[in-house]
Amino acid sequence: MTISGNGSIIAPVLINPNPTTSQAAAIEVGVQANSGTVNIYDNVTLEGNSGAAGSYALRLVNGTANIYGGRFKTAGGLNGDSECIFLQSIKPWGGTYRQCNLNIYGGVFETTGDAKYLINCKDEPYKDGKCAIKIMGGIFVGFNPADNTAEGAHTNFVAPGYKSVETTYNGKQAWKVVKE
């Protein structure tokens, strides 16, 4: 699937009898068993909303997401969660975790909440190698993709041959990923 152009995709504001377990995403990849690839280009905005325990611009449960551009932001979840992109590999029927791959080549990523988990994986599948993140471009507001705590101290999501450089974005501290 390809998403490109101008405009916005906004996650719904959930009214849920149990909002502590609900999740909402502007785009979810991999909900079906045989998931493929989504490619995101251009000036599209993906915006997670509040009103759910998890509120993401993009939630990946199985498959691959390639981000070449766009703006990804979230207002944070009810619990203060700030994941803009969350890799939540699924483990169906007691089997093994499904593979999730995120490749970022460009775009802007930000949250109105605490950015310490701006890009994040579910812990167990990340440790098992079932969630892979390679960042080769983009601007990350309040989050250093080369040195963060999303998966423990000094987590580095930046691909070999690239580095993150501190900058500002709309007056806020940010990091831009560039070639070395």
Per-range role (PLM):
Residues 1-113, 121-143, 152-180:
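Surface-exposed loop/turn motifs in large extracellular/passenger domains
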